[in-house]
Structure formats: C-alpha cells, structure tokens
C-alpha cells in the first residue's frame, strides 16, 4: 500500500481552497478550468491577451507575457497556487523548473516535461536518441544552406520543415523539390514562436494514417501511479492544423500494442500526473513516434461526446491525484468551426439547425476576436459507425456560420 496521502480538496475562495493556475487559457484550458471547478477547485487563468476563453470562467484572470520570467514569477507569487498547469508551449519553462525546485508549486505533469516539449528538438532527441523510439529521419538546421545540405545528405524530397518552436501548423510546410526551398525556409522563420531560428527537417514516412493516443498518468485508489490509454483518435490535418477527428480509429492488435508501448515509454520518462497527447504514424503493424504534448490535445476534443470522462476531466482528476476512467461510450467525431473572417465580437448563426439532429453538440469557444483560419468552435456527433459520425459532425460545423457583429 502506498504512503501517498489521499487527496483532500478545499472550498474555493476560502482559506482551505485548492488553488490551480493555468498558464494558457484558450479553448482547451477553458474546459480544464470547468472540469476543475466541478471538483471544487479555485482556478486562476493566465494568458497573454484579455478575455481569453479560460478567463471567462475562472475565479480570477491575469494578462501576462508568459515568456517573461519576472512577470510570470510575480503573478505566481501573488496568487500562490498549489498546482501550475501549463496549457501552451510558449512559457518561460526554465522558471517553472526553478519554482518546482524551490517548492513554490507543483507543475503538472512536471516542469521538465513542459520544458522538453516546448521545443521539438528536446522531445525528438529524448524519443529517438535517449529512448530509442522509431521516428522519421530528421536533422536540425539553423540556416537555409544547412537545410539544403540536410536534404542532399539523406533526408531527400519530399520532406517536411517545422520551426523547433511552433504550434497549430504555424511555419510548417512540405518541400517537394528545390523550387519550394526558399518559400519553405521563409515560412519556417516567420512561424516560430520566438521569430526566426532553428528548424527541424523530417523525411517522409509512407504511413497509412496518424493517430493521437491520449495517455493518462493517474493515481489509483491505492495511491500508486498507473498509466491508462484512451481509444485511439484518428484525425485529418490541413497545413499542420487539425480540422476533424474521430474515435475510435481502427488499428490492428499489433499496432495498438506497439502504440501503447511507445506512449508508455515516453510518458513514463516525462513522469508526473496528467494527460499526454501522443502523436503517432502507423503503417500496417508498424508505428513511429511523432510528437507528445503534456496536456489535453486539440484532436481530443472529440472525447467531449465519446468518452465517459473527456480528456479535460481526465486531466483534472489526474493532476489532483484522483482515479480516472478512460472508457469509450460511443463512436463519435469532431469537426472544426472556423472564423471565416477577421473581426471582433462576431455572431454565430445556424446553431439551432446544427443542434437539431439527434446525437450532436456544439462548443463555441468565446474567443474575443475571429480570424479567417482561427478555430472558433467545434461540432460534435455520435453515431453507430465512424463514417456516419464523421458525416454528421461535418454537417454540424457546416451549419454554423460566423458573421461580423
């Protein structure tokens, strides 16, 4: 029997409160906040812009540049959270390591996990070189000349280039031949979170499909840390950004076992408590590691309609030391609702039509400003088959239109 003490949760806005601070308060953070509040947790939401989705539901909100260590330390010392939950990559992660070492707060899953995964180089070297996991062939490059040398030296065409620090497909493109090189390098320099700089170039893998395997490290009733797996999530990406996802994606027993083995290896090394989005390429029974996020994953929004506990509830329970249940309820799918225009205070039309079909749901994120390719919501659907669920989810998202106020 573990000596780990059973979790005790306090009363929000009182001296006994269990305080959790989210660093990043977008649509994923918003759902984590709601899940935490349902367990009586006092939540502080931090983001770089005002009125972020998570700001709208938290007990308190702060606008802070999270890459500024001094500003971030000041707000953490002001609020004194028990647990810090990084919900985005663009954070002063060296500060999180310091705070964890100082005993100021516990970082979920760990400060090391946040630091390694904010940078594609850190997590790729851990996976491929330390853990020996199968990945695509890759090199890291600092200049366009180095990019050309990497391609000529074995990466070959076609290949993919990504900034080492970016998200949602920003700066990512496919290089199909020498004629694409100039534009791809410029785009990678523009798309990085810290401006121009280092990039990863990856050789193509001839895969059949890619999945997200949501992997949860949580304490059981005996206090021991256990690893749980959600059913695999298939997804479609356009320009590196998710547009639809579905669950469960069919896999051979051998491929599923290998996927879980890879996910167990990388999440076990990163450690801590919480959910991880492990991205994998699959061809037949072969599986390659792609990336991992130590937090809920955008493709996992489908779990809001498919699982007994969605990915946000799983993360909330796990980080609080509570048991989890990753069981699937019914096959389902998600489909993104884009802004389609640039503007503030937009309005959403067709929501009643979107929800008229049984087995559907809509989440509107409440972002204060729309952009043409910004995710403003998601359509959700369940059905007896994956094909039917995907078609239904597409109908839901297509029914919702975004208009200027």
From Swiss-Prot:
Which reaction does this enzyme catalyse, per its entry?
Answer: N(1)-(5-phospho-beta-D-ribosyl)glycinamide + formate + ATP = N(2)-formyl-N(1)-(5-phospho-beta-D-ribosyl)glycinamide + ADP + phosphate + H(+)
Which residues does the annotation say bind N(1)-(5-phospho-beta-D-ribosyl)glycinamide? Answer: 27-28, 87, 298, 367, 374-375
Q: Which UniProt keywords apply?
A: ATP-binding, Ligase, Magnesium, Metal-binding, Nucleotide-binding, Purine biosynthesis
UniProt enzyme class: ligase
Pfam families under this entry? ATP-grasp, PurT_C, RS_preATP-grasp-like
| EC annotation from Swiss-Prot or TrEMBL | 6.3.1.21
Cellular component GO terms, alphabetically?
Answer: cytosol
Query: Domain of life of the organism in this record?
Result: Bacteria
* Chain residues that bind ATP: 120, 162, 167-172, 202-205, 210
**Where in the numbering of this chain does the ATP-grasp domain appear?**
125-320
The UniProt entry, under SUPFAM superfamilies, shows: Glutathione synthetase ATP-binding domain-like (SSF56059), PreATP-grasp domain (SSF52440), Rudiment single hybrid motif (SSF51246)
The protein's job, in short, is: Involved in the de novo purine biosynthesis. Catalyzes the transfer of formate to 5-phospho-ribosyl-glycinamide (GAR), producing 5-phospho-ribosyl-N-formylglycinamide (FGAR). Formate is provided by PurU via hydrolysis of 10-formyl-tetrahydrofolate.
Family annotation (PANTHER family): FORMATE-DEPENDENT PHOSPHORIBOSYLGLYCINAMIDE FORMYLTRANSFERASE
The record's subunit annotation is: Homodimer.
Q: Write out the similarity annotation.
A: Belongs to the PurK/PurT family.
Protein name in UniProt? Formate-dependent phosphoribosylglycinamide formyltransferase
Source organism: Bordetella avium (strain 197N)
Q: What is the lineage of its organism?
A: Bacteria, Pseudomonadati, Pseudomonadota, Betaproteobacteria, Burkholderiales
């Amino acid at each position: 029997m573990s000596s780990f003490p059973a979790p005790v949760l306090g009363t929000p806005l009182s001296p006994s409160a269990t305080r959790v601070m989210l660093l990043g308060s977008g649509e994923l953070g918003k759902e984590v906040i709601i899940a935490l509040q349902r367990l009586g947790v006092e939540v502080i939401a931090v983001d770089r812009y005002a009125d972020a989705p998570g700001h709208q539901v938290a007990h308190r909100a702060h606008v802070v540049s999270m890459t500024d260590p001094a500003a971030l330390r000041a707000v953490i010392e002001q609020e004194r959270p028990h647990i810090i939950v990084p919900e985005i990559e663009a954070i002063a992660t060296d500060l999180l390591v310091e705070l964890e070492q100082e005993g100021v707060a516990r970082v979920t899953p760990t400060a090391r996990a946040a630091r390694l995964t904010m940078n594609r180089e850190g997590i790729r070297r851990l996976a491929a070189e330390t853990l020996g996991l199968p990945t695509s062939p890759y090199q890291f490059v600092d200049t366009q000349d180095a990019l050309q040398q990497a391609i000529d030296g074995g990466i070959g065409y076609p290949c993919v280039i990504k900034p080492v620090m970016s998200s949602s497909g920003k700066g990512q493109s496919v290089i199909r031949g020498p004629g694409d090189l100039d534009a791809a390098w410029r785009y990678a320099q523009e798309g990085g979170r810290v401006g121009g700089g280092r990039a990863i170039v990856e050789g193509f893998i001839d895969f059949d499909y890619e999945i997200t395997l949501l992997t949860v490290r949580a304490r059981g009733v005996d206090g021991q840390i256990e690893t749980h797996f959600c059913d695999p999530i298939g997804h479609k990406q356009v320009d590196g950004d998710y547009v639809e996802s579905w669950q469960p994606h069919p896999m051979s027993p051998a491929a599923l076992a290998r996927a879980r083995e890879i996910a167990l290896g990388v999440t076990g090394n990163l450690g801590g408590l919480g959910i991880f989005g492990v991205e994998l390429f699959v061809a037949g029974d072969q599986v390659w590691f792609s990336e991992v996020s130590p937090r809920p994953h955008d493709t996992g929004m489908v779990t809001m309609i498919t699982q007994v506990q969605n990915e946000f509830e799983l993360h909330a329970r796990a980080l609080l030391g509570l048991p989890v249940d990753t069981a699937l309820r019914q096959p389902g799918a998600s489909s993104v609702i884009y802004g389609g225009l640039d503007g503030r205070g937009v309005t959403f039309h067709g929501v009643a039509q979107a929800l008229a079909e049984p087995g559907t749901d809509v989440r509107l994120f409440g972002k204060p400003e729309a952009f043409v390719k910004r995710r403003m919501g998601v359509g959700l659907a369940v059905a007896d088959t994956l094909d039917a669920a995907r078609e239904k989810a597409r109908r839901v998202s297509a029914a919702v239109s975004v208009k200027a106020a």
